[in-house]
């Protein structure tokens, strides 16, 4: 690329774009504004960066988060000065909490135009509090060689900090004086003749991969403790690994070395690679609702991989067990919300397996009697689930998750909205071999940005699916504005039960008023008309066969809303009755 020497702001911005491109940046999301003009021009004209204009900053940030999560590389977000950057905040929180790399470039007025009512100026320094992995305000643009080198190296460091030691957001606040347009300045243009671009960027390359492993002594200490325990348990929580197969194989190998069962959350890829792990338990939430069985299955040791599953039943049971726990995760967060007897092991499960000596991998423990008890209970509950779902001809919310686990095209990317969908996935998603790719925002667990994140996940991806409730979709309708530049296909399965169905499952539902108006928040939006407004295809699903037909095959482009109308109270009653049947059956 040729740097832009038309003026100091354009040179400054083009060095930012070129440095990040050489490091591996492929996507920049640009929100409209004047102060960010130099950055917008630099990214828009870069031949190796896809620059995507997005009107709404909140939607833009979640869209970028979806792309970054899928690619495993940072995405740049650009906005103008003032309140624009504040709209990035929810996605910044989610990115920090769930470990997604983002580079936030907020343009700003120069220091002399701040705190003096100059207009469109707020305090943007440390705008996102403690959430960024790193944050800095850049110096004002300069053509001095030392300042250009400073800019390049700051970008290199920002790129690194967004990925190591733990991925997350990085914020660069970038002040500009006029001119903001690429107006020619002869003094700056004259630098082009003597500027050696190749030498300037000679040391800028993508980061080398790093594999972290445990030292042999620590590994052996842990293994000796684990292999001496015949009531051990592995718990695999929500996970979106870059290479799901390697992740699943690592957990399967650990389970077979120890002879321990694996409780796998529905948001873990383990349930979609079930052929890799014969010790898989998917119905733990339903099993543990039986107090007698729950007492019999108390563990002595637990290896918890990543965040805990969503299940409150599981969390209460673990708290009561007071088992010695090892939390395996590269994150520097406190990963123990139960405040138990836990030891943090700051490594990936793949790194843990790499650390285990080959000799110990070859001498696997036999399946424990404890593990067999789990597997027997799991078989009984799975049989009950399948029998109940096969008999269920009426459209109910819970069957959607069960059916999708079996009928989606292989390797389909599936974004699962928060609230009730993630819980039904945990209860009813069946283990299989379709290698479905689950995506979700379980860092802060909010419903904001649902559609925009799903669109980011599916951008330039194979045909994808979003499973969402009506309120989560309506909360992010600005995401539909992304269609002009988004490329791909997204089928949006909307459970329309006229409000927040999850609250029907909570104790507050017995207190009406104020429950109906202030918690369930009924809505009467006609999704058919909403789809027409944004030129999306819409279909009202009439039966389970109709749903299966609509998903096989998935279209190759555009948006398709599949509305499934459900009765909220009926769905709640069905779950309660079925949960009681599970307790009785064990």
From Swiss-Prot:
It catalyses: isochorismate + 2-oxoglutarate + H(+) = 5-enolpyruvoyl-6-hydroxy-2-succinyl-cyclohex-3-ene-1-carboxylate + CO2. Its cofactor is Mg(2+); Mn(2+); thiamine diphosphate. Signal peptide: none annotated. Keywords: Magnesium, Manganese, Metal-binding, Thiamine pyrophosphate, Transferase. It comes from the Bacteria. CDD domains: TPP_PYR_MenD, TPP_SHCHC_synthase. Pathway: Quinol/quinone metabolism; 1,4-dihydroxy-2-naphthoate biosynthesis; 1,4-dihydroxy-2-naphthoate from chorismate: step 2/7; Cofactor biosynthesis; phylloquinone biosynthesis. GO terms for molecular function: 2-succinyl-5-enolpyruvyl-6-hydroxy-3-cyclohexene-1-carboxylic-acid synthase activity; magnesium ion binding; manganese ion binding; thiamine pyrophosphate binding. Binds 1 thiamine pyrophosphate per subunit. Its EC number is 2.2.1.9. Pfam families: TPP_enzyme_M_2, TPP_enzyme_N. Gene3D superfamilies: 3.40.50.970, TPP-binding domain (3.40.50.1220). GO terms for biological process: menaquinone biosynthetic process; phylloquinone biosynthetic process. HAMAP family: MenD. Belongs to the TPP enzyme family. MenD subfamily. Catalyzes the thiamine diphosphate-dependent decarboxylation of 2-oxoglutarate and the subsequent addition of the resulting succinic semialdehyde-thiamine pyrophosphate anion to isochorismate to yield 2-succinyl-5-enolpyruvyl-6-hydroxy-3-cyclohexene-1-carboxylate (SEPHCHC). Homodimer. This is 2-succinyl-5-enolpyruvyl-6-hydroxy-3-cyclohexene-1-carboxylate synthase.
